[in-house]
C-alpha cells in the first residue's frame, strides 16, 4: 500500500512539473518577441525551465531506489519556485505589506531579521520586478501630456479678452498660426471714419497709421490694417481722374495724338502759332477711343513771297498756231499747268 501511494504521488508530481514546464515554455515564446527589451526575463525563464528538466530524471532515479526525499525536494524547490515565479506581483507585495503592518503593531520589527530575509532570497526573485512591470511603460508620459493640454485649455478659458481685438489676436496666436488671419473688410461706414480721421490729422501724406487708429477707436483694428488701407488710398488719389464734375454732368476728358503722343486737348489748343497764322485743328469724335485730331490743312504760301514762274513757248513752224503757257507753281495740278493760248 505504501508503494502504491508513493507511485501515485510520484506520478502526480511529475505531471504537475511537466505542466509547469509547458507553461514556462509558452511564456518564453511570448518573451522571445521582446528579447531586446526584456533580456533578463528571458534568461530567468530559461533557467527555470532547465531547473525543472533537471529535476525530472532525479525524481525517476530516486523513485526507483525508493528514496522518499524526492517528494520533499520537488515540493521544496520545483513547485514553490515556479509558483512564486508565475504569481502576480500585487499578491506578493500585499502579503509583505500585511507582515510589515503586523510587525509594526506588535513592535516586533527587527532590522537583523529583515536583512537575513533579504539575503536568503535568490537573485532571480529579486529581479522578478522586471517581469511584473506595467503593460504600458509610456503611460506616465501620456498622462503628463494630457495634463499639460488640460491645463493649457483651462488657462485659455480663464484668459480675459481685453477690448475684443486683443483677445482675438491672442486666440489667433494660440491656434499656432495654422490658418491665416482673415482680412478686414472695410465697410462704407468704416471708410468714412477713416476719411474723417485723415481730415482731422492733416491729410493722407501727413497722418500716420498709429494716429489714424487711435483717432478711429475701432475694436480689433491694427496698425498693419490701417497702413495697408492708407497705402491703397494714396495710390487711388494719385491716379488721374477720368471724369470732371460739371453741373452734375460728367464730361469725358479728350485726348489728341500729336507726333505719336497722347496730349490733352486743353494743352493742344494752347499751341504756338507759326508764321503769323494760328494753327487750328478740327477733331473728330469716335465712340471708343475718344477724340482724334484731323490732319492740318496744307499751308499755302503768302502772296508777297509767291511768284509763279511762267514760261511762254511760241510755236515754230507751220503746224504751231498758238502759244503754250507753262506755270511752275506747286499748288497747281499737272492738268492746269499747260494752257494753250490761240493767236487771234
UniProtKB/Swiss-Prot annotation:
PROSITE patterns: HTH_MYB (PS51294). Gene3D superfamilies: Homeodomain-like. InterPro entries: Homeodomain-like_sf, HRS1-like, Myb_dom, Myb_dom_plants, SANT/Myb. GO terms for cellular component: nucleus. Disruption phenotype: No visible phenotype under normal growth conditions. Residues 269-291 have a biased composition (Low complexity). Induction: Induced by nitrate. Down-regulated under nitrate deprivation conditions. Residues 209-234 bind DNA. One of its GO terms (biological process) is negative regulation of abscisic acid-activated signaling pathway. The keyword NADP does not apply. Residues 178-238 form the HTH myb-type domain. Keywords: DNA-binding, Nucleus, Transcription, Transcription regulation. NCBIfam families: myb_SHAQKYF (TIGR01557). Plants over-expressing display increased susceptibility in primary root shortening under low phosphate conditions. This is Transcription factor HRS1.
